[in-house]
A protein has these predicted regions:
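Membrane-interface extramembranous regions at the lipid-water interface
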Residues: 1-28, 73-90, 104-134, 154, ...
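Hydrophobic alpha-helical segments
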Residues: 52-103
Length: 165
């Protein structure tokens, strides 16, 4: 039972391999995107047009709490990924440094973890649903790129033609 609790993705102790890290971040993104979509349907009167550009204080507090939760869980996943690389969790603060965060993210996504036990425990096996989620993510990224690149090229051509006229 305690192994299951320690292996929970919501706990900072333990390790995340690359696939687990991507899958849990994707799951987090889906959760918060779903919250946003539900909120948009429940609170249609809270749009900027109906509020004359002013946001109500309770809504602002709720949004700050939601963003705070998203950042908190992202840092938890980041710490677990750093543990897989046998690095201290304090390195996760690099994610808040502009430009460094881009290189740091690439490092975490591309660098393999340690196959043996390290200071932070044994390697965590990637669960089947995590692998499935990563494959889904890659398929969606390829499909999105297949539509986005030609659409962007079309936009650039139209913008150049408009400048010439």
């Amino acid at each position: 039972m305690s192994n299951t609790i320690q292996d929970s993705g919501w706990n900072a102790s333990g390790r995340f391999g690359r696939r687990s890290y991507i899958a849990w971040n994707m799951l987090l993104g889906f959760c918060f995107m779903s919250i946003g979509i539900i909120a948009a349907f429940i609170l249609p009167g809270m749009s900027p047009e109906t509020l004359d550009g002013k946001m109500s204080m309770p809504l602002m507090v709720v949004l700050v709490l939601i963003y705070g939760l998203a950042i908190y869980f992202s840092v938890i996943f980041l710490i677990r990924r750093l543990h897989d690389r046998n690095h201290n969790g304090w390195l996760s603060l690099l994610i808040f440094v502009p430009v460094v965060n881009l290189v740091f993210t690439l490092y975490l996504l591309l660098a393999p973890g340690h196959n043996e036990s390290n200071d932070y425990g044994s390697p965590r096996t990637t669960r089947g649903w995590e692998t499935l989620l990563v494959v889904l993510y890659l398929v969606l990224a390829v499909i999105l790129a297949a539509f986005a690149v030609p659409a962007y090229q079309n936009y650039v051509e139209r913008a150049q033609q408009a400048q010439m006229e």
